C-alpha cells in the first residue's frame, strides 16, 4: 500500500506546528517554508527545520523575493512592528489596525497556490495549513470562508483530488495549545515573533497571543521572551 503524502505550509509558528502534527501518523509529510523577505525568516527557518527533523518530515525553502518588493508590510519593510497590551488583544478596532500594518498582499493565496502546485507534482492528497479562528477575526485569509472557497477552486481547477486541511480553523489559540499538548506536538521548537529576534520580543501581537494562549490553556509556556 502506498503511503499517503501531504504538503504542509510551515512557518515554524505555533499554529502550523500543531496543525501539521495532527496528520503526522497518517501521512508522509513534506514541509515547505516561504522566504518572502520577512524579518523573522531566519528564526522561522530554524524552527521549521527543527520541527521537521524531530518529526521526520522532509523540508525545503521556497524563495519569493518579488513578494517583498511589492509589500509595504511592517513584516518586510523598515516600518515599525506594532505592539499591543494584553487588554488590547480583544479590541477589534485596534487589532484591525495592527493587522493592516503586518498584512502582506495576497500572502496565503500565493502560499496555498504554490503548495497546490507542489502537491500535484508529488501526488499529495492534502495541504496542511495553520489557519485558525482567532486570527480569522482580522485576517480574512485565515477564515473558514476562505478555506471553503479555496477548496472549491481546487475542485474545479486541479485534475487531482487535493484538499486543504486546516484542523485549527474552529479553534482559538489556547485551544490550539491544548491540542498540541494532547498530541505531543513539539511546540517548544516553534517560533511566533514578528521581529525575528532570537528570543520572542514578548510585545508584538503574535507574541502576546502566544503568551495568552499558553496561560489560558494552563500549559507551561516553553518560550523565552525579552519582555
UniProtKB/Swiss-Prot annotation:
Positions bound to ATP: 10-20
Molecular function terms from GO: ATP binding; ligase activity, forming carbon-nitrogen bonds; zinc ion binding
Keywords: ATP-binding, Ligase, Metal-binding, Nucleotide-binding, Zinc
InterPro entries: QueC, Rossmann-like_a/b/a_fold
Pathway assigned in UniProt: Purine metabolism; 7-cyano-7-deazaguanine biosynthesis
Free-text cofactor note: Binds 1 zinc ion per subunit.
Top-tier EC class: ligase
Taxonomy, superkingdom: Archaea
Cofactor: Zn(2+)
Entry annotated with the keyword Ligase: yes
PANTHER family tied to this protein: 7-CYANO-7-DEAZAGUANINE SYNTHASE (PTHR42914:SF1)
Function per UniProt: Catalyzes the ATP-dependent conversion of 7-carboxy-7-deazaguanine (CDG) to 7-cyano-7-deazaguanine (preQ(0)).
Protein name: 7-cyano-7-deazaguanine synthase
Species this chain originates from: Methanobrevibacter smithii (strain ATCC 35061 / DSM 861 / OCM 144 / PS)
Upper lineage: Archaea, Methanobacteriati, Methanobacteriota, Methanomada group, Methanobacteria
The encoding gene: queC
Amino acid at each position: 500500500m502506498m503511503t499517503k503524502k501531504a504538503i504542509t505550509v510551515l512557518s515554524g509558528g505555533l499554529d502550523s506546528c500543531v496543525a501539521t502534527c495532527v496528520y503526522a501518523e497518517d501521512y508522509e509529510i513534506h514541509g515547505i517554508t516561504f522566504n518572502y523577505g520577512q524579518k523573522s525568516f531566519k528564526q522561522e527557518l530554524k524552527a521549521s527545520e527543527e520541527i521537521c527533523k524531530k518529526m521526520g518530515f522532509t523540508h525545503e525553502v521556497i524563495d519569493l523575493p518579488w513578494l517583498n518588493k511589492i509589500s509595504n508590510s511592517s513584516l518586510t519593510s523598515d516600518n515599525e512592528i506594532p505592539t499591543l497590551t494584553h487588554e488590547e488583544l480583544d479590541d477589534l478596532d485596534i487589532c484591525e489596525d495592527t493587522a493592516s500594518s503586518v498584512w502582506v498582499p495576497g500572502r496565503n493565496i500565493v502560499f496555498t497556490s504554490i503548495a497546490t502546485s507542489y502537491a500535484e507534482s508529488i501526488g499529495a492528497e492534502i495541504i496542511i495549513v495553520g489557519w485558525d479562528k482567532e486570527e480569522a477575526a482580522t485576517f480574512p485569509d485565515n477564515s473558514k470562508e476562505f478555506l471553503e472557497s479555496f477548496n472549491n477552486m481546487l475542485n474545479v481547477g486541479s485534475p487531482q483530488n487535493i484538499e486543504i486541511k486546516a484542523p485549527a480553523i474552529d479553534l482559538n489559540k489556547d485551544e490550539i495549545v491544548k491540542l498540541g499538548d494532547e498530541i505531543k506536538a513539539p511546540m517548544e521548537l516553534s517560533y511566533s515573533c514578528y521581529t525575528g529576534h532570537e528570543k520572542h520580543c514578548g510585545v508584538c501581537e503574535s507574541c502576546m497571543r502566544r503568551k495568552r494562549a499558553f496561560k489560558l490553556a494552563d500549559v507551561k509556556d516553553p518560550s523565552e521572551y525579552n519582555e
